[in-house]
């Protein structure tokens, strides 16, 4: 029993904060008039930017829910949600930098639990009934032992007839307890799975709603860990606390009353010994927790090394560094094994001592009980009942000590999940104005911008650019000059720090983001990401309702139809993860087909051919030239040879427009663009 008290160690953490969004969109296209909308927007844009996350506020419903969940939860309190309890557990993925431990959101939990409340209450009643039967069982055993003892001593009467009554009662108790246990486990399993499923769905939807700035600041591994490990941890804790916590607490209280009823003297001796043992266990446990923490940190280092090596396995193989990575990982694993072995020895020694002490308690109970029997203060059956009830108390208290740690771990895991479920994006997913007539004219009006992760570094400074509808404008410049940032602002992945991005004279911050990205803009970047499904489903990604004929037409326009049909499965060919089974040029053309299927009015080409070989570049360039027809096109170029036919070329330098004009005009000026052309030609000649 005392071994389990080791698992209740607390680490104080700071409260979290939540992401708070500023609602700038409208409810739909039928909202206020455009002038009124612009007036509302002008007031909003001058408001202070909201903090990254809002403070947590306690909810009265949460306190009521804590009562419903049983006294086992109440013993932890609200602060327990900010603690981490664990002796031996897998390492959690933690982002760099200090991160405050989030509070458990009882209000959100209540929303998830409310649909399952009837099943939960039924399970609680069944668990309570099973606990009451467990209290009654030691007393019935005592009656049975008294019958056997009396018959052994007196040899009078019919043994089978006398033992039949207590035995049948005990058998009925066992059967009823088994049925109640089966019932509450089934119900709790259903409640736990449904709550966990709803939690995962809500969390995943919340993550998808977040803007790009959120994913710049958070690691993907951390988010996946929230969806998997944290939800699983919370579900397991929830089910165990309800099933085991209520039963253990009821059994402890009930059996203590039974012990006092059977023998107040023996109960008093037990109450004297128990606090001493618990205190000793807590002292030794603090030492073992330090060993455990070091072992966990070492496991985390080994896991991080393996994750990095496997995530970059192509680079590892490209440099033939498999043996070096194996040596590094083996060294970390050996350190982890050594620390865990030391921890295991400590646990083994303590467990052995605990067993000796607990058995001595049993022996002492028999000795003291025998003395009471000799003075006729206790019968054999009562001593048997006392022993069984005391063992039940020990098991229940040990179980509660484990559950205490499980409660804290579960609340901590749930708090981390609810932290992201409660986030509101600064840029809403939908809602806002939709232009009834779209021409496709773009205006970056005195735009300044800094990434949220680098607030002190301006990527764009007073950037001003007007792109007429139906024209192709190319952005060129050195790496880090802000070219891709311009495309990100047009897609409204971010909002400008200053200035505005306008579409047909309307600030895109009052437009519906889902309409803007889903129908107006087609985006093709340097490294297109495909999904591990069929080619036809990848092309349909932007328009799930598109017919096969429309998909085939988009593929023809993207110069992809011929190579797709050359595969044995054609359009139904399954692609590997991220489309690794296709070449770079093939992936790019599938991405172009995906963008063209939406028939966007605006097309963004972010260095779409820079990573391709000459032959693939030629095939993709033909598709891109075809895609530009009748659309406003923003080209972010690395290879300057691909943009000579653009209507206008913009040279970016230090976040500002340095030069603007046609290819021939800029060459004649002999400025930055001409210098870029000259250097690229020189590099090309040297490469040959």
Swiss-Prot record:
The ABC transmembrane type-1 domain, residue ranges: 121-409
Transmembrane segments: 115-135, 168-188, 268-288, 342-362
GO molecular function, one term: ATP hydrolysis activity
Interval spanned by the transit peptide: 1-31
Residue ranges the record marks as coiled coil: none
Keywords linked to the UniProt accession: ATP-binding, Ion transport, Membrane, Mitochondrion, Mitochondrion inner membrane, Nucleotide-binding, Potassium, Potassium transport, Transit peptide, Transmembrane, Transmembrane helix, Transport
Residues in ABC transporter domain copies: 442-679
Membrane topology: Multi-pass membrane protein
Swiss-Prot/TrEMBL GO biological process terms: potassium ion transmembrane transport
A GO CC annotation given for this chain: mitochondrial inner membrane
Biological role stated in the UniProt entry: ATP-binding subunit of the mitochondrial ATP-gated potassium channel (mitoK(ATP)). Together with pore-forming subunit CCDC51/MITOK of the mitoK(ATP) channel, mediates ATP-dependent potassium currents across the mitochondrial inner membrane. An increase in ATP intracellular levels closes the channel, inhibiting K(+) transport, whereas a decrease in ATP levels enhances K(+) uptake in the mitochondrial matrix. Plays a role in mitochondrial iron transport.
Protein name: Mitochondrial potassium channel ATP-binding subunit
Species for this entry: Xenopus tropicalis
């Amino acid at each position: 029993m005392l071994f389990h008290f080791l698992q209740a160690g607390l680490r104080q953490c700071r409260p979290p904060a939540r992401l708070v969004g500023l609602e700038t969109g409208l409810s739909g296209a039928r909202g206020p008039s455009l002038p009124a909308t612009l007036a509302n927007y002008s007031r909003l844009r001058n408001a202070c930017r909201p903090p990254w996350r809002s403070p947590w506020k306690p909810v009265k419903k949460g306190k009521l829910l804590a009562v419903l969940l049983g006294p086992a939860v109440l013993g932890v309190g609200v602060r327990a949600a900010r603690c981490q309890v664990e002796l031996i557990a897998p390492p959690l993925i933690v982002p760099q930098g200090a991160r405050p431990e989030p509070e458990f959101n009882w209000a959100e939990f209540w929303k998830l639990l409310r649909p399952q409340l009837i099943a939960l209450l039924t399970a609680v009643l069944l668990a309570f009934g099973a606990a009451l039967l467990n209290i009654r069982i030691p007393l019935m055993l005592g009656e049975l032992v008294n019958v056997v003892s009396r018959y052994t001593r007196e040899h009078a009467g019919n043994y089978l007839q006398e033992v039949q009554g207590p035995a049948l009662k005990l058998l009925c108790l066992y059967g009823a307890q088994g049925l109640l246990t089966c019932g509450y486990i089934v119900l709790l399993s259903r409640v736990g799975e449904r709550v966990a499923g709803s939690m995962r769905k809500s969390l995943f939807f919340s993550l998808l709603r977040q803007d790009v700035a959120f994913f710049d600041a958070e690691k993907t591994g951390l988010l996946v860990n929230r969806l998997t490990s944290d939800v699983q941890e919370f579900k397991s804790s929830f089910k165990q606390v309800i099933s085991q916590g209520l039963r253990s607490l009821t059994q402890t209280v009930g059996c203590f009353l039974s012990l006092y009823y059977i023998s107040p003297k023996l109960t008093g001796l037990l109450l004297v010994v128990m606090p001493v043992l618990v205190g000793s266990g807590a002292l030794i446990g603090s030492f073992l927790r330090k060993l455990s923490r070091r072992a966990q940190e070492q496991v985390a280092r080994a896991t991080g090394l393996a994750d990095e090596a496997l995530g970059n396995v192509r680079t590892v193989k490209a440099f033939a560094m498999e043996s070096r990575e194996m040596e590094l990982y083996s060294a970390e694993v050996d350190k982890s094994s050594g620390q865990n072995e030391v921890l295991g020895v400590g646990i083994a020694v303590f467990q052995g001592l605990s067993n000796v002490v607990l058995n001595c308690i049993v022996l002492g109970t028999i000795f003291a009980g025998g003395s009471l029997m000799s003075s006729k203060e206790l019968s054999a059956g009562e001593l048997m009942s006392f022993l069984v009830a005391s063992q039940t108390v020990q098991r229940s208290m040990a179980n509660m000590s484990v559950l205490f740690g499980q409660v804290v771990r579960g609340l901590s895991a749930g708090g981390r999940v609810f932290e992201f479920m409660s986030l509101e994006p600064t840029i809403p997913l939908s809602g806002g104005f939709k232009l009834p007539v779209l021409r496709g004219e773009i205006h970056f009006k005195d735009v300044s911008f800094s990434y949220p992760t680098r607030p002190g570094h301006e990527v764009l400074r007073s950037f001003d650019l007007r792109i007429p509808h139906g024209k192709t404008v190319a952005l060129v410049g050195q790496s880090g000059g802000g070219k891709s940032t311009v495309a990100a602002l047009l897609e409204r992945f971010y909002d400008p720090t200053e200035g505005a991005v306008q579409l047909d004279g309307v600030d895109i911050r009052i437009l519906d983001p889902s309409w803007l990205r889903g129908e107006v803009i087609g985006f093709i970047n340097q490294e297109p990401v495909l999904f591990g499904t069929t080619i036809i489903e990848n092309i349909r990604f932007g328009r799930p309702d598109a017919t096969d004929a429309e998909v085939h037409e988009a593929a023809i326009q993207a110069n992809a139809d011929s190579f797709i049909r050359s595969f044995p499965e054609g359009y139904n060919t399954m692609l590997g993860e991220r489309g690794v089974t296709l070449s770079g040029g093939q992936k790019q053309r599938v991405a172009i087909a995906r963008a063209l299927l939406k028939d966007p009015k605006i097309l963004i080409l972010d260095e779409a051919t820079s990573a391709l070989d000459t032959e693939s570049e030629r095939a993709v360039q033909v598709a891109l030239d075809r895609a530009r027809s009748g659309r406003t096109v923003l080209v972010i170029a690395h290879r300057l040879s691909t943009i000579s036919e653009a209507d206008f070329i913009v040279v970016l330098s230090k976040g500002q427009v340095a030069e603007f004009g046609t290819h021939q005009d800029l060459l004649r000026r002999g400025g930055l663009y001409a210098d870029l052309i000259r250097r690229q030609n020189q590099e090309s000649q040297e490469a040959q």
